[in-house]
Amino acid sequence: MNTLNEKNNKVFISGEILTEAEFSHEVYGEGFYEMTVMVKRLSGQGDILPLTVSERLIEDRNLKPGVFINALGQFRSYNKLVDGKSKLMLTVFVRELLDEPRKNPNNIVLSGYICKPPVYRTTPFNREIADILIAVNRSYNKSDYIPCIAWGRNARFAKTLSVGEKIAVAGRIQSREYQKKFSEDDIKTLTAYEVSISKLAAADNADYFDIDEEFDMMGAVSGRTEDADGERYQNKFN
């Protein structure tokens, strides 16, 4: 196993389980289950995030709705056929459960490569944002494709990045509801999952970005990524 790839993608979340575990798949005789967890923001709002957990962890910790968990893992993607079309699915793959929470209940750091041209735009409230899709290498020659959103001056910086450039980011995972119109009478409310970036580094700077150090630092500061959509934390790594 490539331990360097294991460091490219680190997540910590702390929250309340909302749903019963549902069987997802089996690998070498070990079953994996899906559930959702609500992670509270400082504002009181919550991000409802999908988790994938092994049956061993579920049995050891008696994971069920209402239980609070502190989970370390990775943010992973996979393709799923939905109505005959391939859809990118995202989940927090839990590697370890901790007894104690961290001050920051929602913390992610990633290192990967730009795989689509960033899309820069201004919202109706005059906020600058940029959508970025990052390919993060995983062991066994796999990759996870993680949608991210940058704000303010990070968004302006992101729009200058090219496909193939290396990038490192830190922030939080957020859920966001949106409406999609399939026909005049068919409008559905869907949920998107993405990384809200509070810090980013690109090109040579990304090579010197210590994932472990940044992950520990982000977890030690309460609410560090809460205001990622403002200018307060829009700084790049040096």
Placement of each model-derived feature along the sequence:
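Acidic, gly/ser/pro-rich intrinsically disordered tails
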Residues: 1-14, 21-31, 40-49, 58-62, ...
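Flexible glycine-rich surface loops and low-complexity tracts that mediate binding to linear polymers
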Residues: 67-80, 165-178
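Short, structured interface segments
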Residues: 68, 72-101
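Hydrophobic beta-strand-centered segment that forms part of the acyl-chain substrate-binding groove
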Residues: 89-93, 149-150, 173
